[in-house]
């Protein structure tokens, strides 16, 4: 398949993601009793900026990169969301993910709307200096629409605390004063928060703990399969192993490892490279598709979207599915899993730990007072447990599935703020 065809396929997939997000938002607002005008406001971002960023490469040439920043709804407060560096970034994906950030912030009851950014690039082929120049160029290009009270970026796919540090420094230079609250996910010495690196995995862990209670399963010795061994997947494997659960399957882009008696998680974590790859060290590797259908109690898709579909949903043997990735389960597959009695914890709830601790970082920056790792963990647990219970009860009260209940919970805050402002 050609690179051009891959690009077209990615654009089509992103459009489907955007349209499916709109479909569920429409139903959520209808269930909550809002008029059609509210959906017209919420179905698209308020603001979508496309920028062109010229970067001098190490060989002396100048390459122009395309970047995006989407701000979905700022009725509640500033928008918030990550910046991803990836060759498959496109406008529809960024728009959809900014809507998801509105939902995540609403679920966690944070004073934010949703934002998202991205640059079409392959950071794996770029030098340290090229990445720095690209990061600073992006901030210069979007500087008029971002800031601590406007829109607060954060790390995402292939971006990290170093890139956040460059971006914070560039923004501070432009404003001529230090502005750590402009961005989150920074190094600790530049105003980062304890617990930020593990926040997403901690949030998923808490959701698993709450889900097993609902299903009457003991976490100790529960059999868990984790698809994806990046930041969230690897930390989750560690947390589950430490909690006494039996991690029987993990995977990366190369394939999966499966052992019904349990994998040696400390060994795999030690051998994992910076891109989350470890299965290339083994010969007995199965496909990601095969791994998803293995017998287990808890399945955690923590890799990419559209992994559980109508084609394989009937073969999923887990009684609990917790979505640590964005959009790993299609709408059709969600219906099948619900009909089969599988408890599905949706992505916008399960992965809300990251933005929650980003909010804590922003609060600490504004106060100039910093919390211990234990304080951050305690506050995160309080938010995640409350969010899980609210969505679980919403699903029971309205007789809807957990995904629709999560959308209802997530969109309500921005919808109410928009109504009070007189926008609808």
UniProtKB/Swiss-Prot annotation:
According to its UniProt entry, the protein's GO biological process terms are: amino acid metabolic process; glutamate catabolic process
What is the protein name for this chain?
A: Catabolic NAD-specific glutamate dehydrogenase RocG
Family (UniProt):
Belongs to the Glu/Leu/Phe/Val dehydrogenases family.
Q: Where does substrate bind?
A: 80, 104, 358
Reaction catalyzed: L-glutamate + NAD(+) + H2O = 2-oxoglutarate + NH4(+) + NADH + H(+)
Q: Which InterPro entries match?
A: Aminoacid_DH-like_N_sf, Glu/Leu/Phe/Val/Trp_DH, Glu/Leu/Phe/Val/Trp_DH_C, Glu/Leu/Phe/Val/Trp_DH_dimer, Glu/Leu/Phe/Val_DH_AS, Glu_DH, NAD(P)-bd_dom_sf, NAD_bind_Glu_DH
Any GO molecular function:
glutamate dehydrogenase (NAD+) activity
Query: What's its job?
Result: Devoted to catabolic function of glutamate (and other amino acids of the glutamate family) utilization as sole nitrogen source. It is not involved in anabolic function of glutamate biosynthesis since B.subtilis possesses only one route of glutamate biosynthesis from ammonia, catalyzed by glutamate synthase. Wild-type cells are unable to utilize glutamate or glutamine as a sole carbon source; thus RocG does not function physiologically to synthesize glutamate, but it is involved in the utilization of arginine, and proline as carbon or nitrogen source.
Q: Does the keyword NAD apply?
A: yes
Q: Which organism is it from?
A: Bacillus subtilis (strain 168)
For the null mutant, the annotation states: Cells lacking this gene lose the ability to utilize proline, ornithine, or arginine as sole carbon source and grow more slowly when proline or ornithine is utilized as sole nitrogen source in the presence of glucose. A double rocG-gudB disruption has the same phenotype as a single rocG disruption.
KW NAD (keyword) present:
yes
| Keyword list, A-Z | NAD, Oxidoreductase
What's the top EC group for this one? oxidoreductase
Q: What is its EC number?
A: 1.4.1.2
Temperature note from the UniProt entry? Low thermostability at 41 degrees Celsius due to the dissociation of the hexamer.
Q: Where does NAD(+) bind?
A: 200, 231
SMART domains in the record, alphabetically?
ELFV_dehydrog
Listed under subunit, the entry gives: Homohexamer. Interacts with transcriptional regulator GltC.
Q: Which PANTHER family match?
A: GLUTAMATE DEHYDROGENASE (PTHR11606), GLUTAMATE DEHYDROGENASE 1, MITOCHONDRIAL (PTHR11606:SF13)
Q: How does activity depend on pH?
A: Optimum pH is 7.7 and 7.3 for L-glutamate deamination and 2-oxoglutarate amination, respectively. Half-maximal activity for deamination is observed at pH 6.9 and 7.8 and that for amination is at pH 6.9 and 7.8.
**Any idea which residues are catalytic in this one?**
116 (proton donor)
